């Protein structure tokens, strides 16, 4: 069903059960899923969050300037991308980290054509550093990169199997949506992504699939056209 996707992973997901730091079991499990999908023919670019290390907005009111705090958060995404890339390489798949601002020799400066070349030869492109600007979330960065590389869909990997009427971890009566339009998600105040990311995806006709990244085989199922998670579309 999909040939090329942008996979968005939260920083907390890389931090394991505690959501802090880097959890090698989580990194290894995600790398195996990503590598299996890549070997099956899916072209995958990845944008990681940085909340397991630092999030700029959390520093406001604690002595951190928002602009500098966001810069620290962007650096956290680079650390996460470098860590995940190593585990992907261990699975026999090329993994190249790109950054939104120049950081050679740590990683390559992001150029759309260079990232696409990695995808076309079967590798994984990890695009770090958000948009390179403060006040933009990594969700917005993921939406931007998905549009730039011509992805068929933006996949948001979470720890729940889709979008619900309420938080299923807190409300046992919450009901899962199989499909939603952007307008429905906004009107129902379902926080799938922030408004800027929504606007980018809506304007660019970029579908979003919210799914459980911790369930083995979900990425490969998407390639086969199987229904996984919740589809949010224009």
Label each region the model flagged.
Residues 1-234:
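C-terminal catalytic "cap/lid" subdomain
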């Amino acid at each position: 069903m999909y040939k090329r996707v942008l996979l968005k992973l939260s920083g907390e997901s890389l931090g394991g059960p505690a959501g802090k730091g880097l959890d090698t079991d989580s990194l290894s499990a995600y790398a195996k899923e990503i590598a299996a999908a890549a070997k099956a023919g899916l072209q995958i670019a990845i944008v990681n969050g940085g909340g397991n290390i630092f999030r700029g907005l959390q520093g406001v009111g604690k002595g951190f300037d928002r602009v500098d705090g966001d810069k620290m958060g962007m650096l956290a995404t680079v650390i996460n991308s470098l860590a995940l890339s190593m585990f992907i390489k261990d699975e026999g798949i090329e993994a190249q980290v790109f950054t939104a601002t120049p950081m050679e020799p740590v990683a390559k400066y992001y150029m759309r054509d260079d990232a696409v070349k990695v995808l076309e030869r079967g590798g994984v492109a990890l695009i770090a550093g958000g948009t390179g600007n403060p006040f933009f979330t990594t969700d917005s960065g993921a939406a931007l990169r998905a549009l730039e590389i011509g992805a068929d869909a933006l996949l948001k990997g979470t720890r729940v199997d889709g979008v619900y009427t309420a938080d299923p971890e807190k409300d046992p009566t919450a009901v899962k949506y199989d499909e939603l339009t952007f307008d429905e998600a906004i009107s129902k105040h379902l926080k799938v992504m922030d408004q800027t990311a929504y606007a980018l995806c809506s304007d660019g006709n970029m579908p979003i699939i919210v799914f459980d990244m911790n369930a083995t085989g979900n990425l490969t199922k998407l390639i086969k056209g199987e229904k996984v998670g919740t589809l949010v579309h224009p």
